[in-house]
């Protein structure tokens, strides 16, 4: 047997063995559907989520490397209405939201902006009330792709692919099944960026276990720490809270 023939057979044999090993490793991973449903279970259960129809969150944020601090207030109502206001010391106010149809942002630095394309698709996902519970309505495919270590914990990596827009990767702690990392490709007027988020400090608000600290790692800007200080479920939110600002109406009317 000449060396090239032997080498070729060894390579083929190695490829076969590796393919079998990879297939068996994939079989050992729990299905993404199981992980996503278990997350709902460990954070309170389907019935607890279904009791909530609106929500107000208040908290703070801090850009560690830049020393910038601010406050955050978020209003959300089913099925997909939202309004968020961030006030940064020395930099003014940033707002974004949707009335369920038009998705927009407005800031003292960037002015008014109506989201379209991939940016709009991303906003549709983030504004959906109880998105974690209703993931089957939002994603055309979910798949467990492997294991990743996050802050010393082994986690299952789940890739969720929406009908439109980029895939989202979420990592769930093997032991607790709590989500400990999310990676998205964020679209904005400034371009496309990969953003890693690390939810921690899970505590109960009412019947739900929720993260009260979320660290985001932003390219070129370092870490941003969001701290949730209060969560109110089923508040009466005036309908005009989700109305389009005049500046956004003007942009819409130009189209």
Can you annotate each of these PLM segments?
Residues 122-159, 178-183:
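Short, conserved active-site entrance elements at the starts or edges of catalytic domains
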Residues 21-29:
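Bacterial Sec-dependent signal peptides at the C-terminal "C-region" and cleavage site
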Residues 89, 153-244:
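Gly/Pro-enriched, hydrophobic low-complexity segments
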Residues 104-131:
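Acidic/charged, solvent-exposed loop-and-adjacent secondary-structure segments enriched in E/D, K/R, S/T
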Residues 11-21:
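Bacterial N-terminal signal peptides
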Residues 1-12:
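Bacterial N-terminal signal peptides that target proteins for export
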Residues 27, 33-111, 140-146:
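N-terminal mature ectodomain segment of secretory-pathway/periplasmic proteins
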Residues 240-254:
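Short, low-complexity, Pro/Ser/Thr/Gly-rich segments in the mature regions of secreted, periplasmic
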